[in-house]
């Protein structure tokens, strides 16, 4: 059952169909075991009807083996016909018809860092996690390569969300596999690999994964990471994840975009030239701050 669901139903009909198939199979099994018990039979049939109703009225733009995608209109002050790209019921991208278009705040932040602060022109930028392909939207100055595990995401985004061709190369592959096998080196690697609102696949948070991102960078390259953490960075997950990244890269810049909210986009920037180093603490009795400043 699990083999046929994963290889046949999920691949061809999507996750929702696989879940409904499991529910339907459980109902049939319950009816067979219940025999002539009318109460159990009615309960089973009601469950099947409820599951079917949810699936019939489930507003999904596309459903693949990896995710549910929904594109729909939203209301945002000051924007022209804004629309959202939801992945597994979580907002992945925003876009409107203004000139220039408006994007989600973290995408605006990343675009500003790359184009304005770093002055990137004619640079190679690797984006792990395609989202709505808005990082390169109408951005002809640099060369973008998107890597996403779902082959269908590009066509879905182009047809229903961007309503135009996505700018950049697209490679359907697992992010960790790609950085471990590619011979290419990039000026920037952007990591945005959420499978839902606050969930990163566990194999993409380890020190070994972050070491792999360094492998894909040029010597003077930069790693940019979009995280969703608690706004105060007090949770064990936030502390441990940031510590894991810095165990590979040394000190990184960390910016919380929504400081007044319990959950926030947190943007991390690490340079390939940086490495972990021993640290000291300045104390009244022993303070070498002036010496350290002279050695900058």
Walk through the language-model features, giving the residues of each.
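Glycine/proline-centered helix-kink
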Residues: 1-6
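Symmetry-related core transmembrane helices of the 12-TM Major Facilitator Superfamily/SLC fold
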Residues: 19-48
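Class I S-adenosylmethionine
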Residues: 45-147, 151-162, 237, 241, ...
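SAM/dcSAM-binding transferase cores
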Residues: 70, 262-296
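Conserved SAM-binding strand-loop segment of SAM-dependent methyltransferases
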Residues: 164-175
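A short acidic, Gly/Pro-enriched loop at the edge of an enzyme's catalytic core
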Residues: 180-193
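A short glycine-rich, Lys/Arg-flanked "PGG" loop and its adjoining helix->strand segment in the class I
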Residues: 205-219
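Conserved beta-strand signature within the Rossmann-like core of class I S-adenosyl-L-methionine
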Residues: 220-227
């Amino acid at each position: 059952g699990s083999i046929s669901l994963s290889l046949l139903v999920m691949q061809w009909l999507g996750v929702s169909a696989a879940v409904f198939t499991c529910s339907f199979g459980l109902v049939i099994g319950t009816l067979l075991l219940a025999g002539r018990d009318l109460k159990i039979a009615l309960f089973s049939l009601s469950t099947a009807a409820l599951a079917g109703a949810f699936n019939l009225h489930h507003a999904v733009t596309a459903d693949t083996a990896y995710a549910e995608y929904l594109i729909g209109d939203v209301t945002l002050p000051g924007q022209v016909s804004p629309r959202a790209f939801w992945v597994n019921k979580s907002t992945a991208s925003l876009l409107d018809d203004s000139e220039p278009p408006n994007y989600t705040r973290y995408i605006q932040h990343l675009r500003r860092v790359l184009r304005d602060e770093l002055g990137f022109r004619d640079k190679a930028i690797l984006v792990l996690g395609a989202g709505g392909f808005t990082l390169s939207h109408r951005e002809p100055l640099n060369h973008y390569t998107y890597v996403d595990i779902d082959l269908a995401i590009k066509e879905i985004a182009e047809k229903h969300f961007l309503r135009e061709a996505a700018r950049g190369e697209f490679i359907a592959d697992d992010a960790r596999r790609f950085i471990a096998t590619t011979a290419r080196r990039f000026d920037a690697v952007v990591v945005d690999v959420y499978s839902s609102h606050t969930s990163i696949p566990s194999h993409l948070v380890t020190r070994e994964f972050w070491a792999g991102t360094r492998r894909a960078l040029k010597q003077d390259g930069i790693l940019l990471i979009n995280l969703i953490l608690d706004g105060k960075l007090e949770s064990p997950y936030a502390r441990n994840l940031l510590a894991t990244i810095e165990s590979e890269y040394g000190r990184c810049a960390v910016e919380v975009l929504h400081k007044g909210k319990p959950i926030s986009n947190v943007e991390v920037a690490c340079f390939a030239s940086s490495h972990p180093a021993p640290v000291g603490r300045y104390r009244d009795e022993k303070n070498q701050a002036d010496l350290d400043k002279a050695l900058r």
